[in-house]
Amino acid sequence: MVLMIVSGRSGSGKSVALRALEDMGFYCVDNLPVVLLPDLARTLADREISAAVSIDVRNMPESPEIFEQAMSNLPDAFSPQLLFLDADRNTLIRRYSDTRRLHPLSSKNLSLESAIDKESDLLEPLRSRADLIVDTSEMSVHELAEMLRTRLLGKRERELTMVFESFGFKHGIPIDADYVFDVRFLPNPHWDPKLRPMTGLDKPVAAFLDRHTEVHNFIYQTRSYLELWLPVLETNNRSYLTVAIGCTGGKHRSVYIAEQLADYFRSRGKNVQSRHRTLEKRKP
């Protein structure tokens, strides 16, 4: 059974995540004090029900040791996983402005910007321990729920999931990435008028990139690096490894290379997911 702990900065989508987990059959509790986690788990263990609990800045323990103690007291039947939701500062400010809700720390005479920064510092012990960090800056409510369903229901039990995502540097680096590779030095299909409207998923773009030795060398050396360290990462109690590939716009080179890497590790029997941030933004 799984005990999913959902945390993250206010406005990042914790309530949405908890509702999505409830739809997946999790027994959900909002803002349960950390010290009560073992009691909840023992109660649900006999019923063989997985649980999801949200923890925000209001019910954070005074020290990381209290959280670690609660985790160590969980029944053996439960496998704890920590999901941390985040978004960039400007997105959080915009969301609060749109909803006109008060930030949980605003009552301490802090401005919204200061409250967001203070909360980030207070939640850092949980963020650093997270099994999965999700950047919701560019996600709608429905996209976040669907992504969680895909990652949580699609993942094999106790196996590391490799996530390959493409992005454009002009849109910013994904904050959920464990590794970031820059491919802006590779030949750019953008300068071919026939290829410009296409993406790295289209065969003519793939054929263009496939003709260049440096593209093959980069893919080979990147996958070799990941293969070298993958056994260590798999034994390090991780659930996800997110590898971000970036080019200028996130449309051609990064998409192609992310797909090549995903296909390679998928062919090796790994649990693999891929996503393309720029292409997802362009969907109607």
From Swiss-Prot:
Keyword Metal-binding attached: no
GO molecular function terms attached to this record: ATP binding; GTP binding; RNA binding
Superkingdom of origin: Bacteria
Chain residues that bind ATP: 8-15
Entry keyword annotation includes ATP-binding: yes
Matches recorded under Gene3D superfamilies: P-loop containing nucleotide triphosphate hydrolases (3.40.50.300)
Signal peptide: none
Record key words, sorted: ATP-binding, GTP-binding, Nucleotide-binding, RNA-binding
Chain residue ranges for the region called RNA-binding: 266-284
Binding sites annotated in the UniProt record for GTP: 56-59
Pfam families: PapZ_C, RapZ-like_N
NCBIfam families linked to this entry: PRK05416.1
Subunit relationships: Homotrimer.
Family: Belongs to the RapZ-like family. RapZ subfamily.
Task of the protein: Modulates the synthesis of GlmS, by affecting the processing and stability of the regulatory small RNA GlmZ. When glucosamine-6-phosphate (GlcN6P) concentrations are high in the cell, RapZ binds GlmZ and targets it to cleavage by RNase E. Consequently, GlmZ is inactivated and unable to activate GlmS synthesis. Under low GlcN6P concentrations, RapZ is sequestered and inactivated by an other regulatory small RNA, GlmY, preventing GlmZ degradation and leading to synthesis of GlmS.
Protein name per Swiss-Prot or TrEMBL: RNase adapter protein RapZ
Gene field: rapZ
